[in-house]
Amino acid sequence: MKKYNDMKRKVFIAVMSLVVSGGLSGQSVYPGQHSGKLKKETIAPMQVKSFDLKDVRLLPSRFRENMMRDSMWMASIEVDRLLHSFRTNAGVFAGREGGYMTVKKLGGWESLDCELRGHTTGHLLSAYGLMYAATGSELFKHKGDSLVSGLAEVQNALGNGYLSAYPEELINRNIRGTSVWAPWYTLHKLGLIDQYLYSDNQKALEVVIRMADWAYHKLKPLDETTRQKMIRNEFGGVNESFYNLYAITGDERHRWLAQFFYHNEVIDPLK
């Protein structure tokens, strides 16, 4: 039993390392990557540029062993489990045979009483894109495509471009300045941009642009006092997501959204 627990602990550490590194490299757009997909390139002089994951393969090594171990875990997760809280929020289970009760639920942060639900799905959506780029395995392409299709279905059911595993009321609570657990941070981690950049999923880009349209119409009418009150709540790096989307689309509304999340109280004292 001890040996089994030690093995589980090692796998958990390895998986979390992938998730953390995927969050760093997958959520950012580095100069030199994603040729042909960016309308706004970096104009600052760069001495070193990054490379695309698809252009590199790991040779037999501890790193490759860990990557393949992680890939086995990622491959084992059922897409329906990752979508269950999103589908529940949109009410789409009503049209499915067996409905909600047929899905084996995720717990912890993904439980339906947790305001961070949807977080794990987003991290894995990024990870599937990264793993597909790093290995070329169509399995991870299929996993990512299936998740994106499921999320698009949820977005269509919700109707206004909003997409999440929790009700829009959590965003409204954030805007009012009342207690809520990081709804913008969870949207930041959703991973749709990564699916477009790393897996060439055009539908993922369409879904995230609709989300940005919703966010723009939601936030544009807010005054400065309301904005400052709203961003006192943890919002992660959602501004980075909007800047990355702006780099892809060139749409000035996406840059406006990124600038909207400029946190004066934190950044200004550092000047």
Which residues make up each language-model segment?
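Bacterial Sec-dependent N-terminal signal peptides
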Residues: 1-31
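Glycan-recognition and catalytic cores of secretory/periplasmic carbohydrate-active enzymes
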Residues: 27-271
